[in-house]
Structure formats: structure tokens, C-alpha cells
């Protein structure tokens, strides 16, 4: 319950109703990507939720990054989404471990990139296939990124964090998706099923590491399935 100025208690709005309202008030995403979004949902491939799309779009518009790093490509929807809203000339490097998804993403970068279809231009997206923990270590520090989007295996976030911070430009933004794990992160580890306890513990460790990292200023948001927005201090 919350109170108003005259001391009366007001009921807390239902989270699901709030989510439906916000999504209803939000303009639709890029029309040329709606087909890919539906294909992914029907195939059970996880892609960024509408509220997370709004969050990313906001920071792309505000920060106008020249270089973006994505950890976790899946079938390429989020990379194409970011390309649509990023400034002209922005370069996106995206990393995917799963070979089948990486192959699907490469096909989608050709199929859904309007520049490529129209004039044979480069997509501005480079995909590196492999374990992100290893790939990140191979990227030189002088190849810094203005925005890093982390949306890969949730139990591995803690492994990716040191290199994600290292490669983030001062003043750059790190967006981490799915930190609430469908609300399970709120529960005690003893209330979580045994098979989910490891990822539960690792996600809590990741969130603590974000909040305690002296180079970052981090805000935790209930957006979508939870998102952390971290600013690298200058």
C-alpha cells in the first residue's frame, strides 16, 4: 500500500496491469523486424521483451554510441533492433556460442538488414562465434565500446563482467537483461528448485558485483524481466 497527501492508503498497482498499460502506450518497434520477432517467439527463442526494447532504444537515442558490444546474439533480433536505432556509422560486435543460432543470425542479418537488401552495403554488424568468456579476453582494450548489452547465459554473467567493464568506454552504458529470472531471484535459495540454485546464486553474486564495482554506477530496474543499467564513471 502507498499513501497520498491526506494520509489515505492507496492500493499498489498490479505489476501485470502496469506492464500491459505501458506496452499499450508504447509505439511499435521496427516494422521490418516484426516477422523475425514472431518467428523467434513461435520457435521458443528468447528475445528482448518490449519494455527492454524501450530501454535500449532510449539509451541509443540519448548516448548515440559509435560502437556497441552485444554478449548473446541468439538469432540476431536484438542486434538488428539496435542497428535500426543506432546512429549512422555505428558498428556492432555480437558474440554467440551456439553454432545453430549463430548461423541463423547470419542469415537474418542478410534477410532483415534493409541496407544490404537495397544496395549491398555492409550491415554494420560483426558476429563472433564462440564462448563469450574467451572471445572477450581476445578483444583489445583500445577497441572500447560505448554501449554493452549483456543477454547471454545468465549463470555466466559473473564471468563476463570483468571484461565487459574493461571494454566499456568511460561514460559508456552496460545494460544487463533478465536479472530477476522471472521473479525467482527474489526468493531464498532454499525456496528455489535444486536445479536452479546454481544460476540463482550466480545471478545474486553478479548483482552484488555490479553494485560494488567502484568503476560503475548501477541502477536496478523491474523493466521486463529485470534490467541493470550501469554507467562507467569517467
Regions found by a protein language model. Name each.
Residues 1-30:
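N-terminal auxiliary segments of SAM/dcSAM-dependent transferases
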Residues 7, 24-25, 44-45, 152, ...:
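A generic structural signal for short
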Residues 18, 32, 52-55:
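Short N-terminal amphipathic alpha-helix/helix-capping patch enriched in small hydrophobics
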Residues 19, 44-45, 176:
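Generic secondary-structure boundary/loop-capping signal
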Residues 20-22, 40-42, 121, 191-193:
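A short, structure-level motif marking secondary-structure boundaries and short turns
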Residues 26-28, 41-54, 61:
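Conserved SAM-binding loop and adjacent beta-strand
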Residues 50-234:
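S-adenosylmethionine/decaboxylated-SAM
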Amino acid at each position: 500500500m502507498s499513501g497520498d497527501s491526506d494520509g489515505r492508503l492507496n492500493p499498489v498497482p498490479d505489476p501485470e496491469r502496469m506492464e500491459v498499460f505501458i506496452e499499450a502506450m508504447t509505439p511499435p518497434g521496427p516494422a521490418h523486424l516484426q516477422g523475425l520477432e514472431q518467428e523467434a517467439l513461435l520457435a521458443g527463442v528468447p528475445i528482448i521483451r518490449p519494455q527492454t526494447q524501450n530501454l535500449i532504444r532510449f539509451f541509443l537515442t540519448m548516448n548515440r554510441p559509435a560502437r556497441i558490444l552485444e554478449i548473446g546474439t541468439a538469432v540476431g533480433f536484438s542486434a538488428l533492433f539496435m542497428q535500426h536505432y543506432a546512429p549512422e556509422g555505428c558498428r556492432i560486435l555480437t558474440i554467440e556460442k551456439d553454432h545453430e543460432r549463430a548461423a541463423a543470425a547470419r542469415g537474418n542479418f542478410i534477410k532483415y538488414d534493409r541496407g544490404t537488401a537495397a544496395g549491398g552495403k555492409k550491415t554494420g554488424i560483426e558476429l563472433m562465434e564462440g564462448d563469450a568468456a574467451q572471445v572477450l579476453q581476445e578483444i583489445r582494450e583500445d577497441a572500447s565500446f560505448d554501449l554493452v548489452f549483456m543477454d547471454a547465459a545468465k549463470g555466466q554473467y559473473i564471468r563476463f563482467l570483468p571484461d565487459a567493464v574493461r571494454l566499456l568506454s568511460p561514460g559508456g552504458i552496460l545494460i544487463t537483461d533478465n536479472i530477476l529470472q522471472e521473479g525467482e531471484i527474489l526468493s531464498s535459495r532454499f525456496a528455489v528448485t535444486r536445479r536452479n540454485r546454481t544460476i540463482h546464486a550466480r545471478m545474486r553474486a553478479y548483482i552484488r558485483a555490479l553494485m560494488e564495482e567502484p568503476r560503475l554506477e548501477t541502477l536496478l530496474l523491474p523493466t521486463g524481466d529485470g534490467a541493470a543499467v550501469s554507467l562507467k564513471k569517467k
